[in-house]
Each structure stands twice: as structure tokens, then as C-alpha cells.
Amino acid sequence: MAFRVPNSSLLSLILLSLLAIASAKVFFEERFEDGWDKRWVTSEWKKDENLAGEWNYTSGKWNGDPNDKGIQTSEDYRFYAISAEFPEFSNKDKTLVFQFSVKHEQKLDCGGGYIKLLSGDVDQKKFGGDTPYSIMFGPDICGYSTKKVHAILNYNNTNNLIKKDVPCETDQLTHVYTFIIRPDATYSILIDNLEKQTGSLYSDWDLLPAKKIKDPEAKKPEDWEDQEYIPDPEDKKPEGYDDIPKEITDPDAKKPEDWDDEEDGEWTAPTIPNPEYKGEWKPKKIKNPNFKGKWKAPLIDNPEFKDDPELYVYPNLKYVGIELWQVKSGTLFDNILITDEPEYAKQLAEETWGKQKDAEKAAFEELEKKLQEEESKEDPVDSDAEDDDNEAEDGEESDSESKPDSTEESAETEAEKHDEL
């Protein structure tokens, strides 16, 4: 009996991966199992205004494992703020991996699904939208224009948005978002364990002034040829070109039989555009033999640039917090992880989302099918239309009575929050 020997390089990779996972330092890991509520503090932010939303502990309306629960927003037009503390640490000389899963069950049209990492001392009971944070990461959806992953880094007390566009998932299933920051100031953003963006903290955020700038003293040389095409000096205008009329008498026009010259005046044939007329003559263009390209000022060292070898460092990370405003509730968070090992994060994602995603999708599709079947069993079209009219009238009254005054400003509030990000 023959045995196949594993490829040595593949075996080495597997061993390295196992060693990395075994040596991983986990700073925070929350799977929302028993006792989770003792680790998390719900903020009193917005409670005085009756705008603080309640969190539900649930696996959601559809899931891949009913025993795997997370926390879910439960009330529309509400603010949400909750946080957990962990032993303070610095990511100096370490890779920082921030990961969590999120599901929007509510067909989200405007709202966030991001989480924040906070530093220093925070009054968790007062944690809210004005609380300073170090990192904000996760999906954000609002209308047709905003469907992206936020990756905001605080540097010198300024929040800096990533300059690259990273599209987020927009369906109603669970997805895993991972943000990796390395000691060499590079980063990666993953969705469902697949890399969606990578680059440098130097180039993809405006954390520092540019290393190079255009020389303000440089001027384009007078003899610089930046026209790629020029008129052909050998091209000559054809003889008689300017004599060609723009319009000519319509050769097909005929004087009407009932035309009376004495009463109607002398008949004149109408004119039509002359097909021979080509407009103002211009010589044809040829490639400029002296073309040097578009002139650009040379780059020089920026005197205002000062490198920061610890650009990637957050020296006193201590809290993870979820702070949201949601017009429609139903966003569910789970499996929040902060570690120094990407392989451990990948393994956690596969153990949770990876094992459940197919069952969750099947459960969602089954529920959608049942809803469609129920809709098809409704009353005939005419009755439906009549009912819809009645419901619309009732709805207008009930909406005006049931919504708090603050909801009238909800669209403006949401727009303001997105403008601030």
C-alpha cells in the first residue's frame, strides 16, 4: 500500500501556522456566552432623552446555530452605546488584529455596523458619540452613496479616514470584518477571511505631511513643448474652399401651383444645408516632433515632514465599544477579537462564521420563501388595493401618534453623523 508524502513546503506552512496560533496573544475575545453581561457596560448616554436603545441577546431570526448568540439592536430611531474593558496594552512591536462579525437583519438602508477601540480611562456609563476613540472599524451603509468599510485612525487627536474605497457587504447575512495593522506600518482589511484592501499607513491615511512636495520655485521652461499634436505646416487649403456656400437652393423645391406672384410676391425657392460645405478650414493635426509631455514641477523634500517610526502604535488600548445611531434596528454583533496573530483570527472566523454560513443562508432562504408564500395567499388585487388605501390612512395617523418628536429629525441626525465620520 502506497502512502503519499505531504509536500515539504506545505507541511512547513502548516506547522508555522499552528505555531503562530499556539503563541498568539489574545487581548480580548468575546463570543457572548454565559456571563457576557457582566463584562459589558451599557451606557446611560441619551437615556435622559428617551433615545437610548435596548440590546437583545439573541442568535437572530435566522442563523447557522441557535446556541451561538450575540447582541442585537432592537429599537428603531435609537442611539446605542455599550463597552467592555480589557487589560491595557500597547501594540508596539506587535501586529494588531481587530476582528468581529456583524449581521444586518433589517435590510439596512442607513446605519453603521462598526466598532471602536478606546484608550486610557473611559467612564463607560457616559460612553457615547463624543467619547474620543483610537480606532473605528467596520461597515457603514446609508442610501446608494455610502456602502463602505470605515477604517478611521486617530493620530494626534485627529480622526483620519482611509483614503481608499473599501466596499462592504450589503446583504442580510453574517460577515466577518478584520483589520490588521503591522509594525512596518502596513495594513490589511479582510471580509470573510478574504483580503479586500492592503497598503501603507503613510499613503492611505493623511496621518503625516507628505514626504515629498512639488517645488514651489520651479517654473516651466519657455521652450517646453507640451502640445502633443500641432497643425501640419505642409497642409494647404484647397483652392475655392472659401467660395463654397453654407446653404444652397433646394433643387427639389417647386413653386406651388396656387402661388400668385401678384398677391404672394415673387416665389423664392427655400435653401437647404450644402452637403459640400465643410465649415471653416483648419489644417490637419500631426504629432509634434518636439513634444516632451505634460510639464510637472519636480518633487523636493517636504520641510514640514517629520517621520514617526511609531506611527502604527497605540500605547494604551483598554476598551472596545459599540456606539451607533440606527433608523432601523436589527444589527447583530458577535465574536469580537483583539489579538496579535492573524492566523488565530482566521481560525476563529472559520470556527464560527465558516462553519455556520451555509446553514444560516439556507435558514434565511427558507424564511424568505415562507414569506413569499404567505404574500401570495393574500386577498384578490382589488381587495388588496382597498386594504392598502385604508392601511395608508391609518398608518399616517398611527405614525404621527407613535413616533417621538425626535424622529422628525432622524434623517438630519443620520446625515450629520455620516458627515462627521
UniProtKB/Swiss-Prot annotation:
The keyword Signal applies. It comes from Prunus armeniaca. Molecular calcium-binding chaperone promoting folding, oligomeric assembly and quality control in the ER via the calreticulin/calnexin cycle. This lectin may interact transiently with almost all of the monoglucosylated glycoproteins that are synthesized in the ER. Sequence repeats lie at residues 196-207, 215-226, 232-243, 250-261, 265-275, 279-289, 293-303. Keywords: Calcium, Chaperone, Disulfide bond, Endoplasmic reticulum, Glycoprotein, Lectin, Metal-binding, Repeat, Signal, Zinc. Glycans are attached at N56, N156. Pfam families: Calreticulin. Can be divided into a N-terminal globular domain, a proline-rich P-domain forming an elongated arm-like structure and a C-terminal acidic domain. The P-domain binds one molecule of calcium with high affinity, whereas the acidic C-domain binds multiple calcium ions with low affinity. PROSITE patterns: CALRETICULIN_1, CALRETICULIN_2, CALRETICULIN_REPEAT, ER_TARGET. Residues 223-232, 381-399 have a biased composition (Acidic residues). Disulfide bonds join C110-C142. Residues 196-261 are annotated as: 4 X approximate repeats. It comes from the Eukaryota. One of its GO terms (cellular component) is endoplasmic reticulum lumen. Residues 233-257, 350-380 have a biased composition (Basic and acidic residues). This is Calreticulin. Residues 217-283, 350-421 are annotated as: Disordered. GO terms for biological process: ERAD pathway; protein folding. An alpha-D-glucoside binds at Y114, K116, Y133, D140, E323. Residues 1-22 form the signal peptide. GO terms for molecular function: calcium ion binding; carbohydrate binding; unfolded protein binding. The keyword Endoplasmic reticulum applies.
